[in-house]
Amino acid sequence: MTNSTIRIAVVGAGGRMGRQLIQAITQTKGVVLGAAVERAGSTLVGSDAGELAGTGLLNIAVSDDLSKVTDHFDVLIDFTRPEGTLEHLAICRAHHKAMVIGTTGFDDAGKAAISAASAEIGIVFAANFSVGVNVVLKLLEKAAKVMGDYTDIEIIEAHHRYKVDAPSGTALAMGEAIAESLGRSLKDCAVYTREGHTGERKPGTIGFATVRAGDIVGEHTAMFADIGERVEITHKATSRMTFANGAVKSAIWLSNHDNGLFDMRDVLSLNEL
């Protein structure tokens, strides 16, 4: 990217996260909203993106086709759903546009497609764009190295009633951070939502529990429990703006990377700690 001002496009512009992303872009120096996209047939198509997000008139009409606005942005921010994100990925790859991906729930094939595209374009792909959550992931790596071999590890997450995937991408990222520190594969040691006569807890496993209720933005706790004591590392989000601001920060950071697959820990230089 050669422009001093980074042009950002937002897909899913009319959703809760999309509106917050537009707000974050308008409040951040060095970036502008270049395009806003909604699904074909949406009643929001043609409306002004700024008025939609409550930031005032921006003179950017919401489009129903990302491929028609590729000349208007440098980086795409996508917090939609896996099938839509993969369609957007193909368009960005064809037009050499960077991507910030906050969509969760990808299967292995979807993750492989993202990895393959990163050979040609810059991608920041993260389960959570909160600075706090990514600090927590680093703390979990450290805690697991000290306590992980002898404690019972459980991850509990809670989100609003509208979230469609479980466990959350952040909960899985927490589990992966712990498992990797212990030299394990999360696929081999994860236990999801126990029910019925489960028998005693198996050593070396990582348990997951999920809550879906009300308007909870996002709460995650990792527990390292031993006999006589336990350590809990918790993050609670109270506003989606923390994710939106992190995504915009990632878009700015990507301006210095023509290709490659990164996560929020790269953006925050946490991998250097």
Curated annotation (Swiss-Prot):
GO CC terms, sorted: cytosol
UniProt: NAD(+) binding residues: G12, A13, G14, G15, R16, M17, E38, G102, T103, T104, A126, A127, N128, F129
Keywords of this entry: Amino-acid biosynthesis, Cytoplasm, Diaminopimelate biosynthesis, Lysine biosynthesis, NAD, NADP, Oxidoreductase
UniProt: (S)-2,3,4,5-tetrahydrodipicolinate binding residues: H160, G169, T170
Pathway: Amino-acid biosynthesis; L-lysine biosynthesis via DAP pathway; (S)-tetrahydrodipicolinate from L-aspartate: step 4/4
Active site positions: H159, K163
Subcellular location, principal: cytoplasm
Compartments, record wording: Cytoplasm
Protein family: Belongs to the DapB family.
PANTHER family according to UniProt: 4-HYDROXY-TETRAHYDRODIPICOLINATE REDUCTASE 1, CHLOROPLASTIC-RELATED (PTHR20836:SF0), DIHYDRODIPICOLINATE REDUCTASE (PTHR20836)
Function summary: Catalyzes the conversion of 4-hydroxy-tetrahydrodipicolinate (HTPA) to tetrahydrodipicolinate.
NCBIfam families linked: dapB
Name of the featured protein: 4-hydroxy-tetrahydrodipicolinate reductase
Species this protein is from: Yersinia enterocolitica serotype O:8 / biotype 1B (strain NCTC 13174 / 8081)
Gene field: dapB
